[in-house]
């Protein structure tokens, strides 16, 4: 269907024309036997709806609280969460599948990446929603992804690996044409939205809510992504609101994939440690980012760059533009840390000693 919208103000008229995509099938997930009591495990039923949805179809989740562990979306489908629909994360980590960081191929050359942890391809629990090696995927509606991490042990000793590294609320890997729109994501296990090697990613008009004391619960952390738009997102977290990343030295030097062509516009960045952050995992480089019309409200820092010795000669930051950005109650508007080493491998010999590189 074609639409035209016109807005008039102060004698000026702006017109926007757009077309909505055709929907081949409407899949009501409640027909798969969902139990909306917030306790019953609905993982298999929800996954059945997602897996059987035809190309171009929409999986519709009605209002209700649905307990689930990891769900995997497939290409050319839409997940629609109705207002009042809550996907509630399972609190038992043994119910989540473990994804290997990388799978080797038979030719011993090609590699298939599935997940990562703080810039390295390390085995991690699958996220609540997983968008992995797919294309043309939409998650939309006015519903909620609630990881419910505060009622599990996800925030206890967060730097300690237990079985595998912690999951993300929404994990994306090596995918293309992905859109998140309208939903609320809250109480994440660790980083909330973590796309790795994603091209043409739209994160539009949604909310991220994590408690201020929740450890390592960054809002949005694009890693080695291209053509990302983050527009109209309200982020309330206890760590960095938006952190641009490009892997640590192993992947950064091997793949040389920078994070580039990023637009961040009309976002509220509230209470986090950093408003817009570069790094510290940025061995592939961060390039061509434009930030406009954003409000940083009582973040500890405004624009922060984090890097350190050993990131490699591809760790170049270039083409950053900040325009019409307001900061309120920000303790340190601009910070550059050239020797950042909060994570465990920050104490490695090559970081501490130039001769060890």
Locations of regions flagged by a protein language model:
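Extracellular/periplasmic carbohydrate-active domains that bind, remodel
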Residues: 1-357
């Amino acid at each position: 269907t074609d639409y035209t919208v016109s807005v008039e103000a102060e004698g000026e008229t702006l017109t926007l024309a757009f077309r909505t995509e055709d929907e081949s099938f409407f899949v009501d997930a409640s027909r798969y036997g969902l139990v909306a009591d917030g306790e019953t495990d609905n993982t298999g039923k929800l996954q059945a709806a997602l897996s059987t949805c035809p190309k171009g179809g929409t999986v519709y989740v009605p209002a209700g609280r649905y307990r689930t562990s990891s769900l995997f979306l497939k290409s050319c489908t839409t997940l629609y969460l109705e207002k009042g629909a809550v996907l509630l994360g399972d609190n038992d980590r043994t119910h989540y599948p473990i994804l290997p960081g990388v799978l080797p191929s038979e030719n011993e050359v090609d590699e298939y990446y599935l997940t990562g942890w703080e810039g390295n391809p390390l085995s991690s629990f699958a996220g609540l929603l997983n968008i992995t090696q797919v294309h043309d995927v939409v998650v939309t509606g006015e519903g909620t992804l609630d990881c419910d991490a505060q009622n599990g042990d996800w925030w206890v000793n967060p730097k300690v690996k237990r079985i595998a590294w912690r999951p993300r609320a929404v994990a994306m890997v090596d995918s293309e044409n992905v859109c998140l729109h309208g939903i609320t994501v809250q109480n994440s296990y660790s980083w909330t939205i973590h796309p790795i090697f994603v091209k043409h990613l739209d994160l539009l008009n949604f909310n991220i809510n994590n408690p201020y004391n929740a450890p390592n619960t960054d809002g949005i952390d694009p890693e080695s992504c291209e053509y990302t738009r983050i527009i109209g997102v309200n982020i309330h977290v206890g760590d960095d609101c938006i952190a641009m990343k490009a892997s640590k030295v192993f992947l950064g030097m091997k793949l040389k994939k920078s994070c580039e062509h990023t637009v961040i516009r009309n976002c509220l960045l509230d209470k986090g440690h950093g408003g817009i952050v570069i790094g510290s995992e940025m061995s592939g480089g961060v390039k061509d980012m434009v930030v406009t019309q954003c409000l940083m409200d009582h973040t500890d820092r405004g624009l922060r760059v984090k890097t350190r010795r050993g990131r490699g000669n591809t760790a170049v930051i270039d083409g950053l533009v900040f325009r019409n950005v307001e900061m309120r109650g920000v303790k340190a508007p601009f910070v550059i840390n050239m020797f950042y080493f909060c994570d465990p491998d920050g104490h490695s010999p090559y970081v501490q000693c130039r001769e060890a590189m």
